Amino acid sequence: MSTDVAAAQAQSKIDLTKKKNEEINKKSLEEDDEFEDFPIDTWANGETIKSNAVTQTNIWEENWDDVEVDDDFTNELKAELDRYKRENQ
């Protein structure tokens, strides 16, 4: 009989803990609903990332091989690129 009482007490503690956790979760979700509206940026066209993307790409394509890197990976990559160019011509 005492095991039934102990089991009932343990179950009631578990239920209380679950209720407390649910209340905490509800409160935290309610607090997350609030957000701040930020003002819209009014940048000139030349200052945006999208407008600079073309020039950024051209710089990368023109200058990517200017840096001398002499390690195994780079050498294998260059050899693979040369082989790919030969096979697809």
From Swiss-Prot:
Disruption phenotype: Impairs mRNA export and transcription elongation, and induces strong transcription-associated hyperrecombination phenotypes. The modification Phosphoserine is found at residue 12. Coiled coil: none annotated. Keywords: Acetylation, Phosphoprotein, Proteasome, Transcription. The modification N-acetylserine is found at residue 2. The keyword Cytoplasm does not apply. One of its GO terms (molecular function) is protein folding chaperone. Pfam families: DSS1_SEM1. GO terms for cellular component: cytosol; proteasome complex; proteasome regulatory particle, lid subcomplex; proteasome storage granule; transcription export complex 2. GO terms for biological process: double-strand break repair via homologous recombination; filamentous growth; maintenance of DNA trinucleotide repeats; mRNA export from nucleus; positive regulation of transcription by RNA polymerase II; proteasome assembly; proteasome-mediated ubiquitin-dependent protein catabolic process; regulation of cell cycle. Part of the 26S proteasome. Associates with the nuclear pore complex (NPC)-associated TREX-2 complex and the COP9 signalosome. Interacts with CSN12 and THP3. Belongs to the DSS1/SEM1 family. Present with 5590 molecules/cell in log phase SD medium. Versatile protein that might stabilize multiple protein complexes involved in diverse pathways. Subunit of the 26S proteasome which plays a role in ubiquitin-dependent proteolysis. Also associates with the TREX-2 complex that is required for transcription-coupled mRNA export, and the COP9 signalosome, which is involved in deneddylation. This is 26S proteasome complex subunit SEM1.
